[in-house]
Amino acid sequence: MKIIMLGAPGAGKGTQAKMIAEKYNIPHISTGDIFRANIKNGTELGMKAKSFMDKGELVPDELTVSMLLDRVGQPDCKDGYVLDGFPRTIPQAEELDRALSGRNEKIDFAIDVDVSDENIVKRMSGRRACLKCGATYHMEHIPPKKEGICDSCGSELVLRDDDKAETVLKRLQVYHDQTQPLIDFYTRKGILKTVDGTQDMKDVFAAIVEILV
């Protein structure tokens, strides 16, 4: 079972990807992890990727797909995997399709965790973090016992720049411009499944499991 997770930043697709991986005993694969592993191990592909990253340039799609193919060719992927964070664009999706078809493989499901922009802004701008111990809170869902103070170490809680409404809106615009077309791409292939990401985390997961049965 080969699965791609789609959804805007803050939709919760990473959390769902981990839960799927755990339930079905398949790897949860993110491109960030692949880059870090290849660079740490000093692989040829990793060093090529690092040369682009060091210059502040995007790693070419062919290189990313090559690293991804190397990862999904490992023994722990024989029963499938969950891809999180790739593909992000149509060219990446096409490159991935070409590479997989060369191995007589294909993606089985593309799952879109659907949450409105308004909900995502509310979700993310409600986050607070402790810069001292790293603990995270949400003013609505997981509030600290004392407002603005970390339960664990008593330090001040802050709203990270990444979680500020204007930053979130910019990230959402990039998502809609680049990644939204993937919804149409996988719809045409007949493998797109959409779940309501505004539900409780467990309910979202139950809806995904129902799709995968």
What positions do the PLM features span?
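Glycine-rich phosphate-binding loop of ATP-dependent small-molecule kinases
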Residues: 1-213
